[in-house]
UniProtKB/Swiss-Prot annotation:
The active site is at S408 (nucleophile), D600 (charge relay system), H639 (charge relay system). Pfam families: Lip_C, YSIRK_signal. Keywords: Calcium, Hydrolase, Lipid degradation, Lipid metabolism, Metal-binding, Secreted, Signal, Zymogen. PANTHER family: ALPHA/BETA-HYDROLASES SUPERFAMILY PROTEIN (PTHR34043), ALPHA_BETA-HYDROLASES SUPERFAMILY PROTEIN (PTHR34043:SF3). It is found in: Secreted. InterPro entries: AB_hydrolase_fold (IPR029058), Lip-like_C (IPR056304), YSIRK_signal_dom (IPR005877). It comes from the Bacteria. This is Lipase 1. Ca(2+) binds at D638, D641, D646, D649.
Length: 680
């Protein structure tokens, strides 16, 4: 008979626990975890079946602990009933369901009473779990286990008597009294063993302000580490509600620390929480989106737009000048960004030499204080150091490339920079060896594979007659430099890029002293400026010092805005040519060399197509490296039509300008397939 009773009790325990686990897994979305323990107590008739309120099976050690300490099962039943009833009070929105299931819940209090011994003050933190879900699970477990109860009549009578007694109790709902019994060393050891055998699960509420609190449910028997206490503490229902809605108080922080200490000492593994996994997955997705932001651009290598002679960015330009890249028609850089191309506008000297501008362009991209070089500064008589750039691509190094697009003189500047990166500056290297000191990494060379492509728009690769016949005249230089001197005062935002020559008033310097100092500058007699570099002599010197890089894609775009005169072979400016260029266009149109006459107002077609001493070919759909790919000449396009500065020109429309730049940018993206060293 005893064997049969033991079998029935075991069957009831396994059946009830299995159903309870399935129910809680279904209702809590996989957040509740259960553990099953079998209880074999020999011939004792006081063996009871423990049904966990959160889904955990009570262990045999806990039953021994309860029996050894002479726990009054009836009193534990009443205390647990009070706690469950208080759960119902806190969850008012589930009040109706709890009332219907309350009686069935009381029937199982006999089996669950052993859990109440270790209930602590922080039990209220776990009341965020829906009590109706727990009651429903217990109800199903009890109903399915009734058949097993019949097998043990004596056990059933004890359970029925306890249920009848509990059903008639008048349960208080205004306060919850909790006791913390003192424990001796053996009790503490037993309690520690119980905690080790009990699984921990985390419950995350889904709605309201409860979502802000992460609740750790240790099942009622291991809610908090049990410590000897002398006083009883009574919590009202209103206090429980306030604790749920208010921010965490220092006392709660202490409780949490105690719980963490218990977990640490017990070495209990915390089971994965589904809700936490979902939040972590979402966070990873968000992070992925953030990282992918750079990947949204069509171009892997950023595009850097390099302005030409007398070019400015909007923050330092004279107010009479239009926006360089797009004029009043459009903002080219911004339009490229909006259409998926990463692009920048370089800010370098407007009237400096190609060498000085190339050094500035390097630091504009890389970042840092401009170092023109000790040897160069000593040779031409200007300051060695210039302005400091923040840098748009601080990680710019071999393998990390950029596309360089230069308009007018900007194309020459780009070529000079590429030469310095690849081969360095022999004069600077020798000077540093002789005199010591620092040397810029730019002048050391061996910095290949930092440029993906070089594209030039109306660049005077071979110089221009406009500079030979007018631009480089002493009178013209004097006028321009005087204007630069005037704008160099300390109250002006305009920057001509000639500070290395002293054309910038110092903070504590009077304007009179500034003018006197500028008169002594070597700028007035130097060739280290843009006026000279744009002459055919200066351009030829640059061509001798530079070479083609076999790893770079080169391409040129050329415009033409003149036509043949009726009675001669001279070229005359078109009616729609940018008005300031009419004079220079006609001047170039009557040059001695007939092949130089066709021009865009400033630059001859023959000079814009390619350097005379370097290889070239007609551009096709096939992308080639290490050779100038010359695109067909764009007729009726003057020098500024490539950048849209002529707002009065009705022939060249905004849509046409936009299409040109979109095609150019798309072409740059295609070149990355043949210049990407990572794929090669």
């Amino acid at each position: 008979m005893k064997s049969q009773n033991k079998y029935s009790i075991r069957k009831f325990s396994v059946g009830a626990s299995s159903i309870l686990i399935a129910t809680l897994l279904f209702l809590s979305g996989g957040q509740a975890q259960a553990a099953e323990k079998q209880v074999n107590m020999g011939n004792s008739q006081e063996d009871t079946v423990t049904a966990q309120s959160i889904g955990d099976q009570q262990t045999r050690e806990n039953a021994n602990y309860q029996r050894e300490n002479g726990v009054d099962e009836q009193q534990h039943t009443e205390n647990l009933t009070k706690n469950l009833h208080n759960d119902k009070t806190i969850s008012e929105e589930n009040h109706r369901k709890t009332d219907d299931l309350n009686k069935d819940q009381l029937k199982d209090d006999k089996n669950s009473s052993l859990n109440n011994k270790n209930i602590q003050r922080d039990t209220t933190k776990n009341n965020n779990a829906n009590p109706s879900d727990v009651n429903q699970g217990l109800e199903q477990a009890i109903n399915d286990g009734k058949q097993s109860k019949v097998a043990s009549q004596q056990q059933s009578k004890e359970v029925d008597n306890s249920q009848d007694s509990n059903a008639n109790n008048n349960l208080p709902s205004q306060s919850l009294t909790k006791e913390a019994p003192s424990l001796n060393k053996s009790d503490q050891t037993s309690q520690r063993e119980i905690v080790n055998e009990t699984e921990i699960e985390k419950v995350q509420p889904q709605q309201n302000n409860q979502a802000n609190d992460k609740i750790t449910n240790h099942n009622f028997n291991n809610e908090q580490e049990v410590k000897p206490q002398k006083d009883e503490k009574t919590l009202s229902v209103s206090d429980l509600k306030n604790n749920q809605k208010s921010p965490v108080e220092p006392t709660k922080d202490n409780d949490k620390k105690n719980g963490l200490n218990l977990l640490k000492s017990s070495a209990v593994a915390t089971l994965p929480n589904k809700g936490t996994k979902e939040l972590t997955a979402k966070a990873k997705d968000d992070q992925t989106n953030k990282v992918a932001k750079q990947g949204q651009y069509k171009n892997q290598d950023p595009i850097v737009l390099v302005h030409g002679f007398n070019g400015f960015t909007d923050d330092i330009n004279p107010s009479v000048l239009a926006h360089y890249w797009g004029g009043n028609k459009m903002n080219i850089r911004q339009d490229l960004e909006e259409n998926g191309y990463k692009a920048y506008e370089a800010s370098i000297s407007a009237f400096g030499s190609n060498y000085d501008r190339a050094v500035e362009l390097y630091y504009y991209i890389k970042g840092g204080r401009v170092d023109y070089g000790a040897a160069h500064a000593a040779k031409y008589g200007h300051e060695r150091y210039g302005k400091t750039y923040e840098g748009i691509y601080k990680d710019w190094k071999p393998g990390q490339k950029v596309h360089l697009v230069g308009h007018s003189m900007g194309g020459q500047t780009i070529r000079q920079l590429e030469e310095l990166l690849r081969n360095g500056n022999r004069e600077e290297i020798e000077y540093q060896k002789k005199h010591g000191g620092e040397i810029s990494p730019l002048f050391k060379g061996n910095n290949d594979n930092m440029i993906s492509s070089i594209t030039t728009l109306g660049t005077p690769h071979n110089g221009t007659h406009a500079s030979d016949l007018a631009g480089n005249e002493a009178l013209v230089r004097q006028i321009v430099f005087d204007i630069g001197k005037m704008f160099g005062n300390k109250n002006s935002r305009v920057d001509f890029g000639l500070a290395q020559w002293g054309l910038k008033q110092k903070p504590n310097e009077s304007y009179i002293d500034y003018v006197k100092r500028v008169k002594q500058s070597n700028l007035w007699k130097s060739k280290d400026n843009g006026f000279y570099d744009l002459t055919r002599e200066g351009a030829t010197d640059l061509n001798r010092k530079t070479s083609l890089n076999p790893n770079i894609v080169y391409k040129t775009y050329t415009g033409e805005a003149t036509h043949k005169a009726l009675n001669s072979d001279r070229q005359k400016a078109d009616l729609n040519m940018f008005f300031p260029f009419v004079i220079t266009g006609n001047l170039i149109g009557k040059a001695t060399e007939k092949e130089w006459r066709e021009n865009d107002g400033l630059v001859s077609v023959i000079s814009s197509q390619h350097p005379f001493n370097q290889a070239y070919t007609n551009a096709t759909d096939k992308i080639q490296k290490g050779i100038w790919q010359v695109t067909p000449t764009k007729h009726d396009w003057d020098h500024v039509d490539f950048v849209g500065q002529d707002s009065s020109d009705t022939v060249r429309t905004r849509e046409e300008l936009q299409d040109f730049w979109h095609h150019l940018a798309d072409d740059l993206v295609k070149t990355e397939k043949v210049t990407d060293t990572k794929q090669a």
